[in-house]
């Protein structure tokens, strides 16, 4: 019996260490892997991501089914985030300001929460988030990967033009005028 307990404990320690190693590798290598797949401005090879955006089925905070294709006639900024993610929380005011500035010029910002619905609802009410929030929970990780986020890190943002073509992606929080440098030229065209 003691031998079985020792073996179970050893297996648990090995699995725990492997999980920590995998998470650390994803955190450290994620930006490198993302950069090698074209982080930032995008060129060829974005059709798969565009199709994934059009096909994405999510729900809003009231439980109503929503599709990202509802906004594909606009410049669409999809921001993947979670309530527990500090950089996600820090960039929310920038996203709200960008929506207020660029909405009249055909830009929509949609937050896609990789989190529990009740926590997201409470958070959005307390922060007075002014853009649409959709729930993806764990399914959002697969959508993020289809859109180029191989590490699964948050926050992660993709931008699609009015034709639904992915034109930009970013792993990590926006700072200062980052959004203006992306949305300004797109909103002029």
Where are these regions (language model features)?
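Short acidic-hydrophobic, aromatic-tinged amphipathic segments that line or gate anion-handling sites
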Residues: 134-136
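Thiol/disulfide oxidoreductase modules built on the thioredoxin-like
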Residues: 126-129, 138-184
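Conserved hydrophobic/aromatic "anchor" residues
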Residues: 56, 80-81, 123, 131
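Short loop/turn microsegments at loop-to-beta-strand junctions
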Residues: 53-54, 76, 154-155
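N-terminal targeting signals for export/organelle localization
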Residues: 1-55
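Short, ordered coil/turn segments that flank beta-strands lining enzyme active or ligand-binding pockets
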Residues: 61, 71, 162
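Structural microenvironment flanking redox-active thiols in thiol-disulfide oxidoreductases
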Residues: 89-128, 138-145
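Short active-site neighborhood of thiol/selenol oxidoreductases, capturing the structured segment around
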Residues: 68-85
């Amino acid at each position: 019996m003691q031998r079985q307990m020792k073996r179970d404990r050893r297996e648990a320690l090995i699995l725990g260490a492997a999980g920590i190693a995998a998470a650390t590798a994803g955190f450290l290598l994620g930006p490198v892997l993302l950069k090698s797949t074209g982080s930032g401005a995008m060129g060829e090879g974005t059709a798969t991501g565009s199709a994934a955006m059009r096909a994405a089925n999510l729900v809003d905070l009231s439980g109503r089914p929503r599709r990202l294709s509802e906004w594909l006639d606009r410049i669409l900024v999809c921001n993947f985030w979670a309530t527990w993610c500090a950089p996600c929380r820090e960039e929310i005011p920038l996203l709200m300001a960008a929506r207020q500035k660029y909405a009249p010029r055909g830009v929509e910002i949609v937050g896609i929460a990789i989190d529990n619905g009740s926590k997201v609802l409470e958070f959005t009410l307390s922060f007075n988030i002014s853009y649409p929030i959709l729930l993806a929970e764990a399914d959002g990780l697969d959508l993020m990967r289809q859109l180029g986020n191989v590490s699964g890190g948050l926050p992660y943002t993709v931008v699609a033009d009015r034709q639904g073509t992915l034109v930009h992606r970013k792993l990590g929080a926006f700072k200062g005028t980052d959004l203006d440098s992306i949305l300004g030229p797109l909103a002029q065209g």
